[in-house]
Amino acid sequence: MAAKDGAKSQEDYKLKDMKPELGERWPHGGQRGGTGWIGSERAASTYDLVEQMFYLYVRVVKAKDLPPNPVTSNCDPYVEVKIGNYKGKTKHFEKRTNPEWNQVFAFSKDKVQSSTVEVFVRDKEMVTRDEYIGKVVFDMREVPTRVPPDSPLAPQWYRLEDRRGESKKRGEVMVAVWLGTQADEAFPDAWHSDASSVQGEGVQSVRSKVYVSPKLWYLRVNVIEAQDVEPSDRSQPPQAFVKVQVGNQILKTKLCPNKTTNPMWNEDLVFVAAEPFEEQFFLTVENKVTPAKDEVMGRLISPLSVFEKRLDHRAVHSKWYNLEKFGFGALEGDKRHELKFSSRIHLRVCLEGGYHVMDESTLYISDVKPTARQLWKSPIGILEVGILSAQGLSPMKTKDGKATTDPYCVAKYGQKWVRTRTIIDSSSPKWNEQYTWEVYDPCTVITLGVFDNCHLGGSEKSNSGAKVDSRIGKVRIRLSTLEADRIYTHSYPLLVLQTKGLKKMGEVQLAVRFTCLSLAHMIYLYGHPLLPKMHYLHPFTVNQLDSLRYQAMSIVAARLSRAEPPLRKENVEYMLDVDSHMWSMRRSKANFFRIVSVFAGLIAMSKWLGDVCYWKNPLTTILFHVLFFILICYPELILPTTFLYMFLIGLWNFRFRPRHPAHMDTKVSWAEAASPDELDEEFDTFPTSKGQDVVKMRYDRLRSVAGRIQMVVGDIATQGERFQALLSWRDPRATCLFVIFCLVAAMILYVTPFKIIALAGGMFWMRHPKFRSKMPSAPSNFFRKLPSKADCML
């Protein structure tokens, strides 16, 4: 029974094929045809990776000549659009008889049961019931159909009618009503009947939006030297260092080794800056008075926009900058710019445009272009993604005592982020939104995450209790694994690791197509570096890259959270894997078994050769002898045979090639085998928030694991040192024996043809077990007795 449950769960974690009805399907006469304005000669739609969803659009533009209220002599008008049980309202204007709203309402046609569309104009009353001004009624059967790229439907003026529709009243309203799809330009900013329960500021947070990451630059500051820097105590020469701050980033040079008023450093400090350059460049030269006290001797403040932009590896001219004496300006007010001190600093500062500023891991990078746009190459393809729907999403919060989920998707590729609209209170939402990206390198990854919206302005309470959008799951797709011009439609499992273990949160359905614009250019890219050339001409250290990536992620998260509606910090951090560098016992085990899997082929080959040598299958061993004789007699066939063999293996494996993109694999991730304590440790904060006993237990476990790794590394070092000891005379007798052996071997190899040597060595290696001894060989015994530096270890 347990085996069946395990097999079932493994099946749930796999990718599933789908066959959705993609493309346009219209209710009146087939695809792209029928009556009305839709002609059969129209070009193919760009929305061919999603299922068609029909909406009734009502655009309320403005009204004129509205009658005032007979009691207040004023008019505070608003418009209410009613279709069946669905109602949408515009905002009201105070004391306006000619208001302008220019608002669009979108009603899902699948949920519309009414045969009429009613547009009411009402007068807002603060105490009593809102006053009726008039209405306009449209017959659903007479509503025209509009499909992009048709021009927008022109709104028209309609006279208001009384309640019964028998007579006209004073006032007119300008309205346009049409039947369209999610491809309509009005769709993203329209009021949706699906989100009619959302009010106030929450309305903005449910709409679909496209975001662009800020343009990031590396700011390189080469601190060369300073002159005439004086501390407050002039009797003691300063031990100076430089501190530079850009935004929230602070870096320091090393202390000048000599105590002098003319210190030298020649040290590089690298920061991340984003356009538009809002932060100031703030530099101070400080004196290390005591280990706990620093004294500012001078400062420099400058906007980032004044620095030179470098696009290649050419040298940047250095400049001398005057330092302002710190503290004098604060005392003298406006005279601070006049009080220049004689000290100055020598800097070489530039904004690096030839690098790609990495805000994500290189393992699943989505953008490889340099910062400077003039260095970009032409795109080699187009990536189109249809975000169709989701199924079986787990409830993420409680609202009014009811478990519910308000899901939306976020997709990130390159500098472009997209966010779908939020589907209110649905565990099986249907988005059917399509997005497009330009592709500059096929060896990149698109990331898509599903979240629960907790910012709808209601009484939601997430399971964690915090007002953050909860993670439902994530999908990554590497573009190089996709066949060109093929549509992949699959249902991807949404898997999340929690402290209690692995949990499937549902499934998300995607349609993906990668279109190649230039096959020759794409093949050409496979032989070129992934990153721009500056990363290889002037590379950063590993520690620098980690720090700069974290700073870039922080800047991107801060900028996108200021958009309207905001793409929140928790979204950006989850998509960019901000915690991927944190220690995890589970990841360590997974990486170890990945290494084992990589060498599994070599291990299997070694085992097979051992079976051949020990004559486990005599026929195989005899055939191997024959092949060995042929290769010895005709050595020029060795390399052609090897490459021909790999060619045939590639052709054979073509039949079994993967038919679908890779997805989150629970076995590779070692997700199901992780213990609860290991998962609890993985999700612990940094620094830890656990109790002393728990930390002690985990520390001891880590020491045990590290001890085993230490033993393996020591054994590898020992074997290498024994090779070095062969000629080092550390063991004089062993080295003497080896030197004599080398001399004899040189003479034998000189007078004996190589084919004879190779044939004799091969026959000895494959000799029959009758001629083998169970004792270790003499060379092995000799090697094991060589000395190593393990004897010198404390």
From Swiss-Prot:
Entry binding sites for Ca(2+) 1: 76, 123, 125
Q: Which GO terms describe its molecular function?
A: metal ion binding
Compositionally biased residues, Basic and acidic residues: 1-27
Where does the protein principally reside? endoplasmic reticulum
Induction summary: Up-regulated by APL/FE. Not regulated by photoperiod, circadian rhythm under long days, vernalization or gibberellin treatment.
Look up the domain of life of the source.
Answer: Eukaryota
- One Pfam family, please name it: PRT_C
Q: Which CDD domains match?
A: C2B_MCTP_PRT_plant, C2C_MCTP_PRT_plant, C2D_MCTP_PRT_plant
The job of this chain, per UniProt, is described as:
Involved in the export of FT from the phloem companion cells to the sieve elements through the plasmodesmata. Regulates flowering time under long days. May function as a signaling molecule by regulating the trafficking of other regulators.
The miscellaneous comment for this protein is: Unlike other flowering promoters, overexpression of FTIP1 causes late flowering due to the deregulation of FT transport out of the phloem system.
- Name listed for the protein in its UniProt record: FT-interacting protein 1
From what organism does this protein derive? Arabidopsis thaliana
